[in-house]
């Protein structure tokens, strides 16, 4: 499911799409998918694509930040998808926080 979400984001022109395997490092999820967008509209459009693309597999337990569009978080339990505007991604630095996690870059 992480790979599918990452590919949806990449096909939707997100930049710097990565999958972090955080299993064993945290209890909140097994995988993070992180992607950057240039503006809020693009972020909401990509969130919609992920929600639609994964709807046949699973519905998210929770979605946060959709209205603001600066950091959209889609929580699928074992997978958390983060769609950041570039500035917010740099500020929060999830890749730095989870630097020990195995990483796969998409694209």
Tell me what each language-model feature is.
Residues 1-24, 38-45, 57, 64-71, ...:
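Long, contiguous binding/interaction regions
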Residues 27:
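P-loop NTPase catalytic core of nucleic-acid-dependent motor ATPases
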Residues 46-51:
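Short amphipathic alpha-helices in soluble, non-transmembrane regions
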